[in-house]
Amino acid sequence: MVTLCIRYKFNPDKITGIQEYFENEQRVIERSGGKIVGYFLPTDFAGPTDEAIGLIDIPSVSVYEDYRQRLADDPEHKANVAALTASGATVSMVRSFIRRVPVQ
């Protein structure tokens, strides 16, 4: 199991756009083979207010390629991305894979 970590930079004045994307995209991700660990928005009392994180478990890096293709072909995903783009909320997205350290 690997975890896809997506780091979002966004316009804090348009946080509603990214929050709606997170809410709407969850069923698409699950349907495409990912398992949502969670989407995380910043608090207003500590740290940067223009960064968010999405964590998605994927069975393996090789499965990720199929997941990405199913996601790209999904009409609901396309609509979600179009709505996010139209909102002007996102500045950038960076994807990386991370692994869990076992809890002792």
Identify the residue ranges that each predicted region occupies.
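Residues that cap or initiate secondary-structure elements
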Residues: 12-14, 60-62, 101
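An amphipathic, aromatic/His-enriched active-site/gating alpha helix that lines ligand/cofactor pockets
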Residues: 20-38, 57-95
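Short, well-ordered beta-strand segments in beta-rich or mixed alpha/beta enzyme
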Residues: 2-9, 40-72
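Short, surface-exposed ligand-recognition loops at beta-strand->loop->(often short) alpha-helix junctions
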Residues: 10-20
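Intrinsic disorder/low-complexity detector
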Residues: 1-2, 46, 74, 86-104
